[in-house]
Amino acid sequence: MNLFRFLGDLSHLLAIILLLLKIWKSRSCAGISGKSQVLFAVVFTARYLDLFTNYISLYNTCMKVVYIACSFTTVWMIYSKFKATYDGNHDTFRVEFLVIPTAILAFLVNHDFTPLEILWTFSIYLESVAILPQLFMVSKTGEAETITSHYLFALGVYRTLYLFNWIWRYHFEGFFDLIAIVAGLVQTVLYCDFFYLYITKVLKGKKLSLPA
């Protein structure tokens, strides 16, 4: 495992922990898209169904368990524990427009037409657009809390580092995964506008807002 992959995993883990702490400490999930979190739970479930059949390393297994557990814990807090604070009126993105096309694409474009491989491919495609309901919600409300901005920024850094990970692997290992790279590029592009606003506003102590 190279440094970019490791730092990407740490950034991803930091994003998840920031979100969980934000919800738990404030006793509120206001400003958080439950739909995005459900999509992420679907992503990790589909991707890591090989948990009991494909052992790579203790690190790999632990990260899989943490991602699945944290994603479902987040969904539980939003839709059960702190349901009264969930802003469903602004979380209105039509997720079927994300799930159905990515599922169809996974059947059509994959590395191997087997159940686990199709599910893995589906998770890669879906993850690339899973943040859209959250960005749509921020755009609709006009602003985001600072901690939510930190969460989104950490996710964006994770995806950017993973792109460097693919470049590293291609250069030093000769490994090239076009599906993962293209999906990663799509996801990184979605964060570009947010990165600019984060750097120009949040890091200067201002509140983040996206164009409506």
From Swiss-Prot:
Region feature (Important for recycling of cargo proteins with the sequence motif K-D-E-L from the Golgi to the endoplasmic reticulum): 204-207
Cytoplasmic topological intervals: 25-32, 80-92, 136-149, 200-212
One matching Pfam family: ER_lumen_recept
Domain of life: Eukaryota
Main location: Golgi
Residues at the site labelled Interaction with the K-D-E-L motif on target proteins: 5, 117
Keyword annotations from UniProtKB, A to Z: Cytoplasmic vesicle, Endoplasmic reticulum, ER-Golgi transport, Golgi apparatus, Membrane, Phosphoprotein, Protein transport, Receptor, Transmembrane, Transmembrane helix, Transport
Job of this protein: Receptor for the C-terminal sequence motif K-D-E-L that is present on endoplasmic reticulum resident proteins and that mediates their recycling from the Golgi back to the endoplasmic reticulum.
Family: Belongs to the ERD2 family.
Subunit structure: Upon ligand binding the receptor oligomerizes and interacts with components of the transport machinery such as ARFGAP1 and ARF1.
Protein name (Swiss-Prot/TrEMBL): ER lumen protein-retaining receptor 1
